[in-house]
């Protein structure tokens, strides 16, 4: 006895030493070691000591840890006890729960007592469940405190099944689930009886003003509802109804204290999947009854809240949200249970419409998700509706449609004109953000809560507005006439209000928000997928009348303010798809656009009037949108547009940037007219540019040396002329037959097939000269000689810095306007001098567009590769590679190198890729290898970029440096991944699924040279000088803390391993077997590679499986691991030889690596720790009067989780 007390005292002192913050680290470490020794020592001593320390005479810290020790015993050492000892511990644990069930005990001890019993039930399984359940039932009858603990135990049992637990094997989980399922006829009535008994007692005690007792009974009700929630997730719904659970919860809806918890039960039931067995009828009956309960409750709320917004408090709101979520879940998951009754469905839709129309944003948002889901499901997927009649839509079913389609048609017919109109009205009204509503308009909205930045938990405004627009689109597909009428009336009403307003600019935000709705509806009805031409003539006539009337209203407007004109143009844009079917109005719309353009000043002297410049650019961009939307309807007007452009250019009232945009619109129009028209338009647009572009005078004057570029930047007019020429080259390449799909193959189209092909020979040489001299500015020897203003202009733009910092881009200064494609328009164009900002924007624009032009030029066939000399291109672009900033190298790889790698014909790899990739890979390897150690060891990446920020911003500087380093690392890794893509490696067979270990037939091995023309990776490996720096980057990437880059590199390394397997190249095999294998294992030591660990383990598996018979290195690498013995390796080889499953082999390799490193591979060791029932407050909605000690319980549980 004395020994037992002595051990208990020593354990108590050790516990106090661990929790005492003043303890030294050595003291705490010794205490932990002692406690571990007790837990791993004699199991009976552990039991006696723990039960002794949970007694009341000990402090709460000691008692709590003693409970944890008991849980450890039950969880890990239960099998060491004899059956009588186990039975005795069960009884002691139940008694212990009874002892702590008093008001003076704190919450953590109560929760751990219940958790201990739950652990015992989990270990014992169904064998002793009946005995334990009898004890629990008896305990629950002793009083509210005891009942609460019993309910906590009952709650945790099913929760431990439904939440995955590594500590519970599949068989025991199934046994426990089966035992609980068989016990539902006992458990569910107990839950109902406790719920009924203690709810009545709580009401009774509260009526007698015995508030302490009332709270105890109320806590039992809450605990009971939490337990019910845990069973509701998996117990058969008919059982929940049969044993009174649903009716009991429905009764609680009348209580403001418990209705939210009861509604949580209903929400879970509504989301349960409808069975397809014999219980379907019972399930439908339960859901139907539940629907009636929710309908009555929601009707009462909607009627009460519609009369006055002041009657809703937070409790009402939370309950209403839960009701709305429940009903929405019912409609999304179990609509079939009520859809057969048209009257019930009509009531249901009206209820959900009421929530959608509610002034509270949270309720509206939940209903929005429901309506979106419903309309997506009801409307046919391949095509939107055709309209045989004016009333609605055909749902696309045929005579042989299934019963499901028939039900959908029936439900869709219930969404009538009134419901559709209401949905549209609400959607239109809520398209505006609260912060943009002027005060006067805000007052007219009343209590309506518009979306606000202060609204939490529902994401950003952009995604919310997108959901509204999708609902508008779906409604327009279902009810075209209703939606057209509503949007037309809405727009015309807003126009009238604006015209009558003394401050029309206040209405800009409201007008602009509705343009999106108009754009959505017009595009839905006239974009072609609706088979508009196939609908009835009555509908066509009605729609034409509606939109012709609206277009006439828009064309008659004469707004003079630039901000209003921008909105006006947006509305005209939105009408584009309508013009495709009714081309008569195209001429009027084009004339209106030119009228708006010429009414605005083309020369901006005062920066405050730069809104005019932005409005002009918006008008020009509208021509592109109209050309794309109206398609062939614009073709008859091309000559008129060209004549007007010529006249305005001759008059000097059309700036080059504006001319470029209109030229781009012409290219869009020409794409609808055929190849011949496209060639003619390109010739018309490019010929004037070529006359200046190919002249040797400007090239000799400005592009012969770096100082020439400085002179160019002092000639502002010519500087911007060059800029607009390059940007138009980019637009012409994008709009004239360029297709992204070309990038997925190495086969090239015939040069004549692309209208831009024969222009490359004169376009590209001067561009290469321009880029070469631009690159030279960053050379240290040149940089020092540049004027201060030029050096300052070579720093980052504000937008680039904000992007690196992950912050919202600031509004561009008033000195800069932006095209639709993101390029810049200098406000001093045509003037004598360019500012620092102008030069910075010009340099960035030339680089961005120049790289894009080169990249796009490679995609149109072999012309690029035949009209240029590879060595000259390499010299022009790579000459100053050593001086390039990381941001520029990343852009260069992304917009040019990747394109040329994808597009270069295989027979030209030798002449092109070798000269371009060799200097690039060498420099990137040196730069990255220098920068990463600085980040990993000193916390500061060494990058050459010029940030242009003031001192004192060290933290921001560090963030930007790291972002630049990671961006470049990921870009080069993406390039490697591209080079390893199947389309560029057609000669490499796909890895077989079989993983059999065996000797490779040496006769099947080929020379690596055989892959140099049918595999990009093979080509690379055949050029050692190019391959070595690339492979070095790959190996180092594994130890850089960038999981995204590692993902890309793994793909490349996989192909390298495959080529090592297929070829007889000794050097490659040795590299893969030793260097790559070792590097991959080192990569598994990085926690940042946890997400890539399956790929890394697979590479290890492939290296060993495919190469260990031909090279000793894989075995040597594994045996060099600190904890691996030859016997371990031998056992691994025997195990892998017995299975051909790659999945099983990967698991074996993973286990071997963990064993060999002593579980020291962080990427693999980041596993879920053993689950213990400690999350005692999870999914618990606490009553407002809950004691603060509950929060303390969470803290204690986390502290003693181990």
From Swiss-Prot:
Nucleocytoplasmic transporter involved in the nuclear export of microRNAs (miRNAs). Required for several miRNAs accumulation. Specifically required for miR156 accumulation which targets SPL3, SPL4 and SPL5 transcription factors. Involved in plant development through its role in miRNAs processing. Required for vegetative phase change and vegetative to reproductive phase transition. Functionally dependent on RAN1 binding. Does not seem to be involved in small interfering RNAs (siRNAs) processing. InterPro entries: ARM-like (IPR011989), ARM-type_fold (IPR016024), Exportin-1/Importin-b-like (IPR013598), Exportin-5_C (IPR045478), XPO1/5 (IPR045065). Its main location: nucleus. Expressed in roots, leaves and floral buds. It is found in: Nucleus. The keyword Cell inner membrane does not apply. Keywords: Acetylation, Nucleus, RNA-mediated gene silencing, Transport. It comes from the Eukaryota. GO terms for molecular function: nuclear export signal receptor activity. GO terms for cellular component: nucleus. Interacts with RAN1. The keyword Cell cycle does not apply. The gene is HST1. Signal peptide: none annotated. Disruption phenotype: Reduced size of roots and shoot lateral organs. Accelerated vegetative phase change. Increased adaxial trichome density. Disruption of phyllotaxis of the inflorescence. Reduced fertility. Reduced levels of several miRNAs and increased levels of their targeted transcripts. Pfam families: Exportin-5, Xpo1. This is Protein HASTY 1. The modification N-acetylmethionine is found at residue 1. Belongs to the exportin family. GO terms for biological process: leaf morphogenesis; miRNA export from nucleus; negative regulation of flower development; polarity specification of adaxial/abaxial axis; protein export from nucleus; regulatory ncRNA-mediated gene silencing; root development; shoot system development.
């Amino acid at each position: 006895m004395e020994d037992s007390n002595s051990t208990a005292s020593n354990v108590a002192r050790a516990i106090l030493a661990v929790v005492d913050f003043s303890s030294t680290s050595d003291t705490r470490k010794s205490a932990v070691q002692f406690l571990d020794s007790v837990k791993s020592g004699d199991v009976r001593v552990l039991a006696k000591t723990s039960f002794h320390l949970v007694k009341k005479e000990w402090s709460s810290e000691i008692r709590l840890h003693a409970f944890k020790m008991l849980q450890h015993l039950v969880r890990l050492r239960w099998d060491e006890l004899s059956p009588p000892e186990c039975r005795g511990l069960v009884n002691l644990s139940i008694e212990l729960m009874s002892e702590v069930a008093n008001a003076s005990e704190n919450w953590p001890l109560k929760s751990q007592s219940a958790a201990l019993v739950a652990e015992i039930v989990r270990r014992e399984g169904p064998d002793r469940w009946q005995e334990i359940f009898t004890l629990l039932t008896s305990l629950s009858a002793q009083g509210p405190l005891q009942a609460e603990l019993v309910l906590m135990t009952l709650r945790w049992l099913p929760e431990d099944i439904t939440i995955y637990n590594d500590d519970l094997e599949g068989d025991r989980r199934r046994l426990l689930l089966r035992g609980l399922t068989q016990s539902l006829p006992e458990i569910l009535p107990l839950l109902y009886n406790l719920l009924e008994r203690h709810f009545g007692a709580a009401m009774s005690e509260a009526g007698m003003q015995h508030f302490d007792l009332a709270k105890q009974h109320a806590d039992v009700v809450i605990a009971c509802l939490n337990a019910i929630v845990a069973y509701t997730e998996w117990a058969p719904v008919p059982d929940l109804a049969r044993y009174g659970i649903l009716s009991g919860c429905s009764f609680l809806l009348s209580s403001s204290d418990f209705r939210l918890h009861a509604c949580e039960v209903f929400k879970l039931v509504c989301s349960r999947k409808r069975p397809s067995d014999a219980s379907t009828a019972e399930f439908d009956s339960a859901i139907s009854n539940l629907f009636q309960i929710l309908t009555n409750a929601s009707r009462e709320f909607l009627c009460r809240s519609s009369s006055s917004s002041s009657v809703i408090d937070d409790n009402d709101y939370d309950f209403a949200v839960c009701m709305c979520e429940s009903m929405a879940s019912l409609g999304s998951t179990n609509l079939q249970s009520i859809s057969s009754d048209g009257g019930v469905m009509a009531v249901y839709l009206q209820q959900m419409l009421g929530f959608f129309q509610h002034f509270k944003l949270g309720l509206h948002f939940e209903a929005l998700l429901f309506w979106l889901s419903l309309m997506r499901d009801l409307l046919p997927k391949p095509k939107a509706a055709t309209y045989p009649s004016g009333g609605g839509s055909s749902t696309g079913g045929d005579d042989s449609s299934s019963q499901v389609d028939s039900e959908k048609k029936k439900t869709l017919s219930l969404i009538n004109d009134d419901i559709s109109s209401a949905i549209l009205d609400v959607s239109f009204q809520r398209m505006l953000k609260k912060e943009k509503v002027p005060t006067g308009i805000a007052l007219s909205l009343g209590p309506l809560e518009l979306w606000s930045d202060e609204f939490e938990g529902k994401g950003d405004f952009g995604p919310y507005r997108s959901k509204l627009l999708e609902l508008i689109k779906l409604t327009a597909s279902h009810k075209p006439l209703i939606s057209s009428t509503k949007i037309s009336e809405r727009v015309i009403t807003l126009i009238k209000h604006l015209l009558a307003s003394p401050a029309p600019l206040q209405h800009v935000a409201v007008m602009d928000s509705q343009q999106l709705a108009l754009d959505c509806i017009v595009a839905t009805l006239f974009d072609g997928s609706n088979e508009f031409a196939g609908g009835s003539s009555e509908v066509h006539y009605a729609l034409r009348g509606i939109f012709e009337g609206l277009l006439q209203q828009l064309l008659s407007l004469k707004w003079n303010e630039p901000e209003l004109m921008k909105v006006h143009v947006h509305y005209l844009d939105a009408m584009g798809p309508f013009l495709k079917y009714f081309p008569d109005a195209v001429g009027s719309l084009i004339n209106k656009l030119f009228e708006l353009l010429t009414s605005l000043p083309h020369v901006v002297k005062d920066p405050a009037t730069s809104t005019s410049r932005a409005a002009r650019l918006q008008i020009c961009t509208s021509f592109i949108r109209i050309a794309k939307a109206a398609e062939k309807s614009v073709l008859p007007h091309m000559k008129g547009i060209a004549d007007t452009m010529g006249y305005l250019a001759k008059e000097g009232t059309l700036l080059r940037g504006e001319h470029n945009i209109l030229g781009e619109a012409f290219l869009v129009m020409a794409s609808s007219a055929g190849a011949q028209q496209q060639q003619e338009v390109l010739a018309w647009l490019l010929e004037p540019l070529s006359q200046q572009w190919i002249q040797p005078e400007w090239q000799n004057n400005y592009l012969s040396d770096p100082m020439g570029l400085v002179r160019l930047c002092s000639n502002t007019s010519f500087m911007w002329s060059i800029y607009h020429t390059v940007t138009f080259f980019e637009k012409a390449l994008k709009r004239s037959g360029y297709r992204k799909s070309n990038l997925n193959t190495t086969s090239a189209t015939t040069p004549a097939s692309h209208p831009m092909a024969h222009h490359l020979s004169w376009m590209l040489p001067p561009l290469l000269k321009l880029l070469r001299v631009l690159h030279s500015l960053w050379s240290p020897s040149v940089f020092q000689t540049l004027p201060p203003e030029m050096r300052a202009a070579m720093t980052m733009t504000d937008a680039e810095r904000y992007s690196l910092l992950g912050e919202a881009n600031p509004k561009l200064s008033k000195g800069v306007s932006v095209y639709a494609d993101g390029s810049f328009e200098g406000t001093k164009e045509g003037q004598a001098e360019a500012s620092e900002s102008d030069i910075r924007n010009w340099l960035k624009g030339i680089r961005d567009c120049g790289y894009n032009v080169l990249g796009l030029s490679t995609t149109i066939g072999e012309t690029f590769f035949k009209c240029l000399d590879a060595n000259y291109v390499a010299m022009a672009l790579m000459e100053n590679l050593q001086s390039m900033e990381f941001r520029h190298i990343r852009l260069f790889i992304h917009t040019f190198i990747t394109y040329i790698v994808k597009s270069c014909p295989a027979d030209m790899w030798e002449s092109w890729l070798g000269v371009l990739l060799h200097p690039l890979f060498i420099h990137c390897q040196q730069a990255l290898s220098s920068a990463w150690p600085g980040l990993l060891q000193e916390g500061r990446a060494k990058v050459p970029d010029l940030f242009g920020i003031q001192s004192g911003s060290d933290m921001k500087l560090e963030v930007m440096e790291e972002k630049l380093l990671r961006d470049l690392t990921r870009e080069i890794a993406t390039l490697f991944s591209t080079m390893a893509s199947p389309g560029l490696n057609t000669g490499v067979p796909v890895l077989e699924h079989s993983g059999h270990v065996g000797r490779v037939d040496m006769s099947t091995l080929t020379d690596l040279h055989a892959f140099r023309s049918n595999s990009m990776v093979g080509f690379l490996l055949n050029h050692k000088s190019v391959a070595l720096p690339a492979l070095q980057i790959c190996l180092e990437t594994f130890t850089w803390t960038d999981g995204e880059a590692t993902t890309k590199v793994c793909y490349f390394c996989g192909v390298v391993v495959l080529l090592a397997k297929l070829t007889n190249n000794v050097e490659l095999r040795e590299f893969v077997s030793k260097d790559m294998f070792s590097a991959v294992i080192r990569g598994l030591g990085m926690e940042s590679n946890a997400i890539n660990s399956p790929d890394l383990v697979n590479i290890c598996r492939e290296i060993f499986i495919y190469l260990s018979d031909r090279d000793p290195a894989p075995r040597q690498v594994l045996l060099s691991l600190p904890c691996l013995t030859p016997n371990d390796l031998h056992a691994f080889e025997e195990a892998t030889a017995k299975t051909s499953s790659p999945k099983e082999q990967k698991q074996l390799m993973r286990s071997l690596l963990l064993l060999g490193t002593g579980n020291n591979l962080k990427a693999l060791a980041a596993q879920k720790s053993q689950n213990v029932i400690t999350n005692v407050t999870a999914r618990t909605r606490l009553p407002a009067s809950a004691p603060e000690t509950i929060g303390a319980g969470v803290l204690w549980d986390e502290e003693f989780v181990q």
